[in-house]
Amino acid sequence: MSRSQKNDNFIDKTFTILADLILKFLPTNINAKKAFSYYRDGMSAQSEGEYAEALANYYEALNLEEDPYDKSFILYNIGLIHASNGEYVKALDYYHKALEANNKLPQALNNIAVIYHYQAVKASEINDLETAQALFHEAAQYWKQAIKLAPSNYIEAQNWLLSTGRL
């Protein structure tokens, strides 16, 4: 039984039923349908904190998915898991891959900026000011791109850019 068939709450059950109907009637090839099923199971596992299971499902979806736009969201979610596990280098790699597949993904740009900002703060704490400035600069560049794509989002980033003279 797939993970999505085990959902216990009403919203998850409703989503699962709708997703199954869409899969059944959507005129796509079998690999695209399988990829979506793995992606859906990955999202379900991720939402429950089952990151190993989520990653396994996302990797299966990634192997089956052919559409770059759809792949970008799989790659993005893999990046989210690595970031939440503190694996920032891996997270950055997957966020960049997501952007290669879909350069209109402001959430990936934002998350890259957040990681660079975090690393800059850590560098500042140990008085590595040159590294900190370089990382703050990188964060600013990615936040500017994210804000350009989604001007009403990332208000805190906009405020930081303004208050630090980077906007």
UniProtKB/Swiss-Prot annotation:
The keyword Cytoplasm does not apply. Belongs to the Ycf3 family. It is found in: Plastid, Chloroplast thylakoid membrane. It is a peripheral membrane protein. Essential for the assembly of the photosystem I (PSI) complex. May act as a chaperone-like factor to guide the assembly of the PSI subunits. It comes from Galdieria sulphuraria. Its main location: plastid. TPR repeats lie at residues 35-68, 72-105, 120-153. This is Photosystem I assembly protein Ycf3. PROSITE patterns: TPR, TPR_REGION. The keyword rRNA-binding does not apply. One of its GO terms (cellular component) is chloroplast thylakoid membrane. Keywords: Chloroplast, Membrane, Photosynthesis, Plastid, Repeat, Thylakoid, TPR repeat. Signal peptide: none annotated. InterPro entries: PSI_Ycf3_assembly (IPR022818), TPR-like_helical_dom_sf (IPR011990), TPR_rpt (IPR019734). GO terms for biological process: photosynthesis.
